[in-house]
Curated annotation (Swiss-Prot):
It is an enzyme of class 3 (hydrolase). InterPro entries: MetalloPept_cat_dom_sf, Pept_M54_archaemetzincn, Pept_M54_archaemetzncn_arc/bac. Its EC number is 3.4.-.-. It comes from the Archaea. It comes from Haloquadratum walsbyi (strain DSM 16790 / HBSQ001). GO terms for molecular function: metallopeptidase activity; zinc ion binding. This is Archaemetzincin. The active site is at 131 (proton acceptor). Its cofactor is Zn(2+). Zn(2+) 1 binds at residues 130, 134, 140.
């Protein structure tokens, strides 16, 4: 299985490294990093000052060379009526996206004594694993520690672990 990371807009090398390592570690897949892509034309919603997540997924699906593809951007994304999303994927699809925009808050809610850079890296890793999980057909999990649990805020992202719980792992394998 090949997962292609598609950087959309300017993205630090650290973000690409963390995403790649997490995907290889959890899914035991091959990972490539595509050349950087421009932000999709027409993706910006001026009334919200945010970008439409679906257009980033479409770009990752079209440009990516993997069986699964994940766009990663530093831009602020939204989907339908949600104020924002950390990421988005379609169940069993081949494209997905995460945004680092709202993952960069410095606090981890006092859960761990990690540096802001380490907290940010953990969040990137969890969100790419989560969104690629959806492309493999995994839905949201009720186990708050599972990487597939729904995370409306960074607090929930910080609570969950980077790995699939036993139930989700059995569904996948």
């Amino acid at each position: 299985m090949l997962v292609d990371i598609v950087p959309i807009g300017d993205l630090p090398a650290q973000v690409k490294r963390e995403a790649s390592a997490a995907l290889r570690g959890v899914y035991e897949c091959d990972v490539t990093v595509h050349e950087e892509q421009s932000i999709p034309d027409g993706a910006f919603d001026h009334s919200r000052s945010q970008y439409r997540a679906e257009q980033f997924i479409e770009l990752a699906s079209r440009i990516g060379s993997g069986e699964k593809n994940i766009g990663i951007t530093a831009e602020d994304l939204y989907y339908r009526r949600r104020n924002y999303v950390f990421g988005l994927a379609y169940l069993n699809g081949n494209g997905s996206v995460i945004s680092t925009y709202r993952l960069q808050t410095s606090s981890d809610g006092g859960l761990k004594s990690k540096s802001p850079d380490a907290v940010f890296a953990d969040r990137i890793r969890k969100e790419v694993v989560h969104e690629i999980g959806h492309t493999f057909g995994l839905e949201h999990c009720d186990n708050s520690k599972c990487v597939m649990s729904f995370s409306p805020t960074v607090r929930e992202v910080d609570v969950k672990e980077e790995n699939l719980c036993g139930s989700c792992n059995r569904l996948l394998y």
